[in-house]
């Protein structure tokens, strides 16, 4: 039987997914059926990603991955899709300084393949080739978020 304690008596860190869910999904194809006709060049696709986490208890957290993709041909929207995909995670035994990286890097990394598949399916079902979103560097996203928050804190700390 596996021992849940290491040699100094501390609990080994555990991260598990208790549930995954689609909170919100929308797909707009405002130019249909004209937008489905062959075109000379591929539309420009802009993808925005956001991650949020909220505590549900001392060990359970709701982590939400938001993906927003818009395809444009010039100034005309070809399609627009939004997905808010969440997971309830049990996070236990991690040192406090590791909690934010676990919630904002590891949890969305686990959710991403499922969210990516939903976006691919909905764009395909909308009459377009499946939109296969490239892997996301959640470590870089988290580092950028921390840097932005530190910069905001510095600006607020400067007296007028």
Swiss-Prot record:
Q: Which Pfam families does the record match to this protein? A: SecB
Gene Ontology cellular component terms for the protein in this record: cytoplasm
What name does this protein carry? Protein-export protein SecB
- Native source species: Rhizobium etli (strain ATCC 51251 / DSM 11541 / JCM 21823 / NBRC 15573 / CFN 42)
Question: What are the BP-aspect GO terms?
Answer: protein folding; protein tetramerization; protein transport
Protein keywords: Chaperone, Cytoplasm, Protein transport, Translocation, Transport
- Keyword field contains Chaperone: yes
Q: Which GO terms describe its molecular function?
A: unfolded protein binding
- Any idea where this protein resides? Cytoplasm
**HAMAP family per the record?**
SecB
State which gene encodes it. Answer: secB
Family, similarity comment: Belongs to the SecB family.
Q: What do we know about how this protein assembles, alone or with others?
A: Homotetramer, a dimer of dimers. One homotetramer interacts with 1 SecA dimer.
- Entries under InterPro entries matching the protein: SecB, SecB-like_sf
Function field: One of the proteins required for the normal export of preproteins out of the cell cytoplasm. It is a molecular chaperone that binds to a subset of precursor proteins, maintaining them in a translocation-competent state. It also specifically binds to its receptor SecA.
């Amino acid at each position: 039987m596996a021992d849940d304690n290491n040699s100094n008596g501390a609990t080994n860190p555990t991260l598990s997914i208790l549930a995954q869910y689609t909170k919100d999904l929308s797909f707009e194809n405002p130019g249909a059926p004209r937008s489905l006709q062959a075109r000379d060049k591929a539309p420009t696709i802009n993808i925005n990603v956001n991650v949020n986490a909220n505590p549900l208890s001392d060990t359970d957290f709701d982590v939400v991955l938001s993906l927003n993709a818009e395809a444009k041909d010039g100034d005309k929207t070809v399609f627009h899709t939004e997905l808010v995909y969440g997971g309830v995670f049990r996070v236990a035994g991690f040192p406090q300084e590791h909690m934010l990286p676990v919630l904002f890097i590891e949890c969305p990394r686990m959710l991403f393949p499922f969210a990516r598949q939903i976006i691919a399916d909905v764009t395909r079902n909308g009459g377009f080739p499946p939109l296969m979103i490239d892997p996301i560097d959640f470590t870089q996203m988290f580092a950028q978020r921390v840097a932005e928050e530190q910069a905001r804190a510095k600006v607020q700390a400067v007296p007028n």
